[in-house]
């Protein structure tokens, strides 16, 4: 009956007769009960808890419970002396699926039309009037303990939204929003703001406002909600969401900032968060709070000590003054909004106005993402940010944007600035530079550093040109009319070069050329840039000094970048090299001195204090200083093994997507190109040994391994490991990866295959890094067949099967040392290279294919070829397909030859069968003499040669 009477009353008031909204169920991550034990409570608090629980039980907010869930409960005493019950729901919140916020920000009261009458109401105990879904009630159970456990504890569970539940605000907003929806539909010309349980209604006339409020009362009651009668506001000044609202003006509510509680980072973080929240109303520019923001720097521990500096104290006083005096205006709904951009110090300031009435302030963050942010880019970013804010406030773009730039500067910004193009994308309003005549903005501290005045984008005519350089040894230098070397405390080449640039930025026209792109970009941008604070004090000092130096100049300058260590001709490269020489490291100086004087290793070590290994490497890799070394290879030739497991190359590459296992150790057999790779957490000797043991299990044990000069490969532990397995070890040229070209190419091939599998593969079961590697290796070794091959790498590795049609053929090969052409036999042929047997008692020679010619092809006069370097035989006419991939295959004859050499047995009969050479007297003939065809069955030419056979065929 009561419900029927209530519905009749609501109908009489004119509201729609609808059922109250149904409870909104929660989504749970788990149905496993969460039980957190109740802690003991003092007797006084326990008595207060019993009273509060009985009160809630009478109101129907809780009910007795036998739930397997439990959350601790406690009470606090208010200033008025009353007690308040709270539930610790942190454990329960952890298993609730968040609903997400429905109102991510506070509504702006400035959008309330000016001079419209208002009514503001507050819903009474809003959470306690919204029911929980029946199935969710048991999850919010709590226990009231008994002293000394002398009786069973009393247990209850919430039937309404509990305070502190993760989704209570969202459910409350949804519930109240549904109740207000009929009001919004019927009174669409009224302006209604609803935030949690606070509701503001505005209408053009008082009569319409009363009608709207009457209907709203009925709808709220119909939804089971209650209005707090003591919190209804009907006259100015209104207080809503921390603001004092008058007929036309809006002011922040008067507050006092307590400074005695500011002792730790957390205290200052909260204070600045609150100040930032009301800054759009206060209008405090970013530069006026820089000292307060600086206090947040340093240790990120919330309890770390912080102190209020005198400068920051002044800024807090400014905030308090602004709170007392600042005000913004309610808008005219029929007039458009405009955006003014002021070029204030530190960063620009935006102001949203309507006519000359201030609506809201807009600021950029104090800290930036980039180290240098150009002032023009900051203006563009602020425009884009404030345009979005205006659209959010009223649903429209501003009618006009006023910027501190001329029309020509605006035109250039559209052409040259990507940030400007983004900030003003799709803007169809007016861009102007005429500010309204009003005194309310005159307090702003403006800057003149908007666009560059000193820095030029084009070289200066008739100006001095200076080259700068820096080194990690702390030396900086510049060259020009005079040279100078400057000692700096920095261990960074870029920082040392910054010192050189600052030094040469004297007050006269100058063109600066630097080989550091970092320094060039910093110097170009620093004039108008906001410099991001860095924890590195040295870097801060350098950048600030650079900016001050540039801004103090009276004459323009130009700076550009030049690539270092190139062999390009011209005076720029020469002059830059001269500057580089002034600061080059000990190793570079040692290499340059040896190239000039060919001093021995001991002399290099003594003069430059380099290690013995580095000194010996410099000498050993000098072609003029080699006295007794293994034969050097021709340019473009990377030695291969002549049979499986003869020579491996090994390296470490990085695959970032593997996470901790990003160090991928790669081994490739240079004969078969069989690849094996394993992923590890590092590249130390222990990781290398683990990788090699894996390789031995798959590929076998090699005779020789070639690596770079990494610490993991040069350690004593690794050498001992190799000696145990009877493996010889060589390294490439220090700091030069060309000696390991095969494995470097393999790294790229492997990474490409991994990318293909990741982006286009269907093998979702390959979840771990090693599984992904294994799939890639299986494809490369057992499935792929490369051009000019007939078998896979796995078949070649396991069987040693021949794979090139040119193996065993007679060829002419060019001896670059003697400038002569010799005859030989192909042992193996790959992409751009070949291994040739030059004759008896001689080791095989690796030669680029451009220095080869098949034996049955026409040849020019041997005498002329010997005497005139320009008259060489035609280059090999081998199809380019024969030079693919560089895979090598052995012949049985070469195997015999190698085995004999390895055993130091000298020349054997079998070795003679494959080691041959045209006699010396043939060299002088225009055409080699012809002899009868050889009749021996084992003739190396198959008995078909028109020339004489030597050695065992003679």
UniProtKB/Swiss-Prot annotation:
Protein residues bound to Mg(2+) 2: 469, 580
Chain residues forming the annotated DNA-binding region: 809-857
Reaction equation(s) it catalyzes: DNA(n) + a 2'-deoxyribonucleoside 5'-triphosphate = DNA(n+1) + diphosphate; Endonucleolytic cleavage to 5'-phosphomonoester
SUPFAM superfamilies: DNA-binding domain of retroviral integrase (SSF50122), DNA/RNA polymerases (SSF56672), N-terminal Zn binding domain of HIV integrase (SSF46919), Ribonuclease H-like (SSF53098)
InterPro entries: DNA/RNA_pol_sf, Integrase-like_N, Integrase_C_dom_sf_retrovir, Integrase_C_retrovir, Integrase_cat-core, Integrase_Zn-bd_dom_N, Rev_trsase/Diguanyl_cyclase, RNaseH-like_sf
Alphabetical GO biological process terms: DNA integration; DNA recombination; DNA synthesis involved in DNA repair; DNA-templated DNA replication
One Pfam family hit: RNase_H
Sequence motif YXDD, location on chain: 195-198
One example GO MF annotation: RNA-DNA hybrid ribonuclease activity
RNase H type-1 domain sequence ranges: 460-588
Keywords, sorted A to Z: DNA integration, DNA recombination, DNA-binding, Endonuclease, ERV, Hydrolase, Metal-binding, Multifunctional enzyme, Nuclease, Nucleotidyltransferase, RNA-directed DNA polymerase, Transferase, Transposable element, Zinc, Zinc-finger
Enzyme Commission number(s) of this protein: 2.7.7.49, 3.1.26.4
Binding site for Zn(2+): 594, 598, 622, 625
Binding annotation for Mg(2+) 1: 469, 497, 515
Membership in a protein family: Belongs to the beta type-B retroviral polymerase family. HERV class-II K(HML-2) pol subfamily.
Additional remarks: This protein is synthesized as Gag-Pro and Gag-Pro-Pol polyprotein precursors. These polyproteins are thought, by similarity with type-B retroviruses, to be generated by -1 frameshifts occurring at the Gag-Pro and Pro-Pol genes boundaries. Exact N-terminus of this protein has not been formally described.
Protein name per UniProt: Endogenous retrovirus group K member 25 Pol protein
Native source species: Homo sapiens (Human)
Gene coding for it: ERVK-25
């Amino acid at each position: 009956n009561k419900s029927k009477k209530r519905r009749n009353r609501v109908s009489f008031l004119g509201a729609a007769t609808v059922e109250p909204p149904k409870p909104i169920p929660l989504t749970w991550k788990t149905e496993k009960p969460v039980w957190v034990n109740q802690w003991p409570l003092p007797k006084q608090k326990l008595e207060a808890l019993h009273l509060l629980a009985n009160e809630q039980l009478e109101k129907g907010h809780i009910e007795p419970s036998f739930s397997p869930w439990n959350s601790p409960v406690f009470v606090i005493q208010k200033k008025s002396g009353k007690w308040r019950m709270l539930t610790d729901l942190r454990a329960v919140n952890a298993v609730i699926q968040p609903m997400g916020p429905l109102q991510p920000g506070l509504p702006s009261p400035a959008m309330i039309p000016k001079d419209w009458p208002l009514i503001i109401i507050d819903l009474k105990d809003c959470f306690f009037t919204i029911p929980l879904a029946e199935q969710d009630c048991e999850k919010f159970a709590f226990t009231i303990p008994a002293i000394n456990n002398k009786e069973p504890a009393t247990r209850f569970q919430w039937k309404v939204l509990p305070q502190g539940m993760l989704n209570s605000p969202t459910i409350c907003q949804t519930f109240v929003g549904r109740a207000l929806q009929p009001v919004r539909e019927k009174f669409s010309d009224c302006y209604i703001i609803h935030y949690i349980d606070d509701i503001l209604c505005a209408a053009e006339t008082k009569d319409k406002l009363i009608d709207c409020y009457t209907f709203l009362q009925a709808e709220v009651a119909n939804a089971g909600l209650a209005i707090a009668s003591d919190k209804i506001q009907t006259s100015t000044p209104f207080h809503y969401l921390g603001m004092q609202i008058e007929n036309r003006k809006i002011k922040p509510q008067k507050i006092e900032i307590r400074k005695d509680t500011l002792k730790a980072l957390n205290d200052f973080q909260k204070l600045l968060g609150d100040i930032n929240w009301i800054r759009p109303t206060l209008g405090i520019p970013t530069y006026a709070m820089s000292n307060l923001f600086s206090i947040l720097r340093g240790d990120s521990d919330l309890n770390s000590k912080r102190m209020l500096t005198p400068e920051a104290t002044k800024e807090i006083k400014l905030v308090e003054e602004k709170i007392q005096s600042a005000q913004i205006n309610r808008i005219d709904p029929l007039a458009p909004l405009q955006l003014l951009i002021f070029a204030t110090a530190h960063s620009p300031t935006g102001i949203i106005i309507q006519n000359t009435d201030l609506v809201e302030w807009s600021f950029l963050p104090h800290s930036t993402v980039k180290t240098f942010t150009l002032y023009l880019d900051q203006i563009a970013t602020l425009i884009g940010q404030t345009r979005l804010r205006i659209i959010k406030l009223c649903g429209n773009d501003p009618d006009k944007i006023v910027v501190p730039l001329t029309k020509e500067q605006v035109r250039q910004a559209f052409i040259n600035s990507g940030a400007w193009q983004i900030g003003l994308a799709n803007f169809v309003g007016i861009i102007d530079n005429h500010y309204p005549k009003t005194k309310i903005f005159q307090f702003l501290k403006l800057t003149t550093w908007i666009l560059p005045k000193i820095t030029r984008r084009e070289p200066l005519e008739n100006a001095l040109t200076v080259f700068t350089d820096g080194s990690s040894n702390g030396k900086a230098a510049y060259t020009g009319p005079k040279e100078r070397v400057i000692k700096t405390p920095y261990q960074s080449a870029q920082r040392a070069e910054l010192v050189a640039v600052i030094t040469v930025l004297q007050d006269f026209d100058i063109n600066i050329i630097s080989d550091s792109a970092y320094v060039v970009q910093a110097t170009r941008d620093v004039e108008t840039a906001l410099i991001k604070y860095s924890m590195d004090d040295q870097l801060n000092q350098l950048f600030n000094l650079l900016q001050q130096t540039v801004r103090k100049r009276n004459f323009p300058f130009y700076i550009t970048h030049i690539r270092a260590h190139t062999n390009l001709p011209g005076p720029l490269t020469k002059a830059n090299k001269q500057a580089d020489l002034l600061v080059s490291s000990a190793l570079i100086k040692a290499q340059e001195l040896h190239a000039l004087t060919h001093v021995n290793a001991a002399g290099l070590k003594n003069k430059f204090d380099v290690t013995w290994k580095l000194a010996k490497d410099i000498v050993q890799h000098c072609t003029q200083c080699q006295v007794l070394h293994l034969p050097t290879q021709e340019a473009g030739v990377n030695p291969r093994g002549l049979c499986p497991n003869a020579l491996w190359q090994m390296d470490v590459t990085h695959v970032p997507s593997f996470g901790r296992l990003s160090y991928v150790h790669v081994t490739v057999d240079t004969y078969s190109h069989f690849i094996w790779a394993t992923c590890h957490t590092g590249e130390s000797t222990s990781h290398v040994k683990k990788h090699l043991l894996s390789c031995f299990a798959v590929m076998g044990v090699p005779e020789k391994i070639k690596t770079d000069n990494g610490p993991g490969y040069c350690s004593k532990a690794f050498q001992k490991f190799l000696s145990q397995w009877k493996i010889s070890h060589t390294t490439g040229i220090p700091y030069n990866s060309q000696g390991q070209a095969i494995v470097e190419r393999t790294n790229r091939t492997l990474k490409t295959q991994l990318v293909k599998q990741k982006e286009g593969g269907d093998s979702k079961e390959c979840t771990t890094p090693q599984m992904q590697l294994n799939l890639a290796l299986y494809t490369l070794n057992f499935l792929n067949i490369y051009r000019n091959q007939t078998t896979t790498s796995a078949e070649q590795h396991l069987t040693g099967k021949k794979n090139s049609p040119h193996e065993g053929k007679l060829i002419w090969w060019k001896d670059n040392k003697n400038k002569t052409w010799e005859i030989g036999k192909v042992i193996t042929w790959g992409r751009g290279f070949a291994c040739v047997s030059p004759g008896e008692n001689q080791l095989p020679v690796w030669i680029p294919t451009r220095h080869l010619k098949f034996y049955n092809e026409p040849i020019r006069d041997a005498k002329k070829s010997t005497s005139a370097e320009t008259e060489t035989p035609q280059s090999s006419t081998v199809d380019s397909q024969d030079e693919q991939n560089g895979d090598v295959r052995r012949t049985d004859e070469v195997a015999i030859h190698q085995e004999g050499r390895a055993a130091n047995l000298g020349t054997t009969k079998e070795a003679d069968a494959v080691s041959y050479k045209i006699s010396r007297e043939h060299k002088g003939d225009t055409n080699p003499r012809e002899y009868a065809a050889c009749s021996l069955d084992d003739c190396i030419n198959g008995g078909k040669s028109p020339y004489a056979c030597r050695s065992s065929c003679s």
